[in-house]
């Protein structure tokens, strides 16, 4: 943390402030020191737990969804499933359990060395890639569960009817916010039209455009689909920057390099980028409805019938409820998919 703090302070000293996106970039991905490079963010010892580690049903029904996609495209040709991020590897492992054959290969797009180690332990045969350009040219299913929320954002606020950008500065050896003239006016104007006129605060995820573009080019060349599952909103605006440390919310500026910085996804930004690139877009739909549409409740009953243990039955119910109940992850998390312009219609988005 002290090394990251020193790097941030030095960069701020050059002109008095840095963008929130730069603060996030250094805090999360600075070589050897950034949170996503050096920390182990998952599980009880980390800062958050994702749906695949809460219930096996999550991965199993998504696995069945993926197999349906493969069958619709061409079940006999070689295919790959790539987990964007991937956590510990639980999701891909659950998907493989649904169907495993020589035609299907598995891989992770991951930069965190601790998670790469964990993924190799649970799934040694899976490949690892650091960039989409490294992934082999094959029909592909990309799955990004809580992947987009970690990319840097820019924030803007309207003060006295004038738009300002929010930056990070130093104040008595602490990081604090300040408001300055907008740094990239072209970027601001490009995205401002996507927000209501009455908005007085909005955010731009600056990496979504590149991610959607890179995945779209890959899928147009090779065929397949990309599934995104993340917390966010279809319409709306406001400050969603947050930090998690030891499973608790903390001030986003207080623990650079040792807390997980994320923001909510504006799914309208994905829709606009997808349409611009001439791709099909499905969703967004709540995680609750998506999983139920895929048969999560039916899978729960099958698993309950396979055991006589009341504790296991209760644990299965509690795990699924956590990811589908509206008061927990079911409503906040949304699901969408993008694919090339073809006749492929993925299940779950009815």
Model-derived segments and spans:
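A residue-level signal for conserved active-site and pocket-lining positions in enzyme catalytic cores
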Residues: 27, 142, 270
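Rossmann-like AdoMet
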Residues: 1-84, 88-131, 135-139, 156, ...
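Generic detector of well-ordered alpha-helical packing
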Residues: 84, 111, 147-150, 231
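Long, Lys/Arg- and hydrophobic-enriched amphipathic alpha-helices
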Residues: 189-350
């Amino acid at each position: 943390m002290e090394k990251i703090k020193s790097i941030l302070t030095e960069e701020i000293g050059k002109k008095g402030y840095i963008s929130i996106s730069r603060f996030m970039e250094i805090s999360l991905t600075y070589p050897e020191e950034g949170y996503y490079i050096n920390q182990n963010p998952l599980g009880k010892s980390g800062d958050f737990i994702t749906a695949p580690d809460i219930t096996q049903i999550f991965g199993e029904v998504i696995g069945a969804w993926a197999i349906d996609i493969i069958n619709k495209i061409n079940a006999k040709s070689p295919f790959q499933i790539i987990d964007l991020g991937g956590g510990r590897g639980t999701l891909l492992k659950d998907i493989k359990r649904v169907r495993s054959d020589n035609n299907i290969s598995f891989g992770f797009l991951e930069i965190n060395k601790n998670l790469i180690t964990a993924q190799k332990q649970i799934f040694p045969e899976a490949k690892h890639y650091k960039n989409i350009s490294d992934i082999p040219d094959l029909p592909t299913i990309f799955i990004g569960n809580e992947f987009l929320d970690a990319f840097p954002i820019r924030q803007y606020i309207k003060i006295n009817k004038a738009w300002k950008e929010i930056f990070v500065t130093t104040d008595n050896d602490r990081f604090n916010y300040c408001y300055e003239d907008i740094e990239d006016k072209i970027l601001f104007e490009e995205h401002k039209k996507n927000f209501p006129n009455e908005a007085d605060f909005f955010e731009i995820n600056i990496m979504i455009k590149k991610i959607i573009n890179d995945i779209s080019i890959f899928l147009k060349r090779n065929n397949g689909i990309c599934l995104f599952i993340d917390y966010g909103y279809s319409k709306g605006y406001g400050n969603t920057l947050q930090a998690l440390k030891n499973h608790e919310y903390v001030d986003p500026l207080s623990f650079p390099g040792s807390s997980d910085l994320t923001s909510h996804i504006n799914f309208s930004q994905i829709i606009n980028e997808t349409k611009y690139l001439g791709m099909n877009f499905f969703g967004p739909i709540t995680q609750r409805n998506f999983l139920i549409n895929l048969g999560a409740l039916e899978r729960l009953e099958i698993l309950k019938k396979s055991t006589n243990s009341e504790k296991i039955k209760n644990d299965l119910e509690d795990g699924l409820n956590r990811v589908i109940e509206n008061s927990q992850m079911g409503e906040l998390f949304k699901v969408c998919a993008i694919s090339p312009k073809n006749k492929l219609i993925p299940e779950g988005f009815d």
